[in-house]
Amino acid sequence: MSSVPEPSAALLQRAVAVRRAAVDLGQTDDGQRALALQAMADALTERAATILAANREDLERSAGEGLAPALMARLKLDDTKLAAAIDGVRKVASLSDPLGCRQLHRELDQGLVLERVSVPLGVVGVIFEARPDAVMQIASLAIRSGNGALLKGGSEARCTNEAVMDALQAGLAASPVSADALALLTTRQESLALLRLDGLVDLIIPRGSNELVRFIQDNTRIPVLGHADGVCHLYVDAAADIAKAVRVAVDSKSQYPAACNAIETLLVHRSIAQPFLAAALPAFAAAGVKLRGDAESVALGVAEAATEEDWSTEYLDLILAVKLVDDLEAATDHIRSYGSRHTEVILTEDAQTADRFLAAVDSAGVYHNCSSRFADGFRYGFGAEVGISTQTLPPRGPVGLEGLVTYRYRLRGEGHITADYANGSCVFTHIDRPL
């Protein structure tokens, strides 16, 4: 961690303020947190023109600096995108309270009762790149789950992020929740020093490039939730419905290619390759997708030859690698070798083949006959997502409120002592009670 600076006194002061506000926030009730979220949404609506003007400034500056097209797409915030993000804040307000949920209720002995109850994590630190809508998503989930949040967006979106945070804090100031529960970090030094705030920050969630995520994972003692790559695959089986497969494949790549849940490699069963590609090539061309294929797919019309590097590349662009495979096992072997355990899709009308794929592929999301783009917290009904995790341990996949809470054991007794159980004068009953 030699490359990570020590936190400044100013950063420590802000982190302590967020921590203190989080303690109070964790003790608010469901109604108070819902009111806070509605106030945040109202403030965002009132300041929409200011936020969009700030975003235009960011876009103009970033275009002049030569920001990559994929990042420009993520950076852009228009009326529709902003309205959807604000609606997402209101939807989070209407979600069931994730706190105080009793997960275990057990009588250990008469008068000695154990409960396991959901509680906030405390403070989350979120580092993300050119995604100004992420500020609204993360802040709403943090407040709903009773957590404070330190947020650091990419410098590309600095004007937008500041305008959004001003609105969010104004909303909190008019609510039962302290505005100190949210803080925006604005410099690279602060984002690096955040990694040293173990003791004040309970979880770090990186949202961005492979390099960003891996750097954070390698340079902090704080637990990290996230994924480093989004190399997603779609396999067209021999028993696929060609018209359906073309429609789903094109959507999975082109609906929003800069997203981590867009497919990067198309695997096609050799026996269906000729008729499928005959239908798919013009559809991909119409969507602006450039294909890079193995020798066999090039022979069937794919314009450009793929290299070994293409199989492991997250393009985040209108580029798709294509490979023909012998069977389901060859497809799943390729996915295991090159995939990032994010989201994988099979297109087939054979239910048994689909079940084998869903069981064999160890990714956070495995889909049958639908677009990979459904891998999203909002589409899952989570209201929004704080990030996507490809780790094996939970939370996994799109992470909503449930990923921002932990649990606490509460034991209530009447003067019970362990010595009475050690000498046999008392005996555990271990009777489960209704939740």
UniProtKB/Swiss-Prot annotation:
Keyword Isomerase included in the entry's annotation: no
EC number in record: 1.2.1.41
Major subcellular location class: cytoplasm
Any one Gene Ontology molecular-function term assigned to this protein's record: NADP binding
Matches recorded under PROSITE patterns: PROA (PS01223)
PANTHER family registered for this protein in UniProt: DELTA-1-PYRROLINE-5-CARBOXYLATE SYNTHASE, GLUTAMATE SEMIALDEHYDE DEHYDROGENASE
UniProt protein name: Gamma-glutamyl phosphate reductase
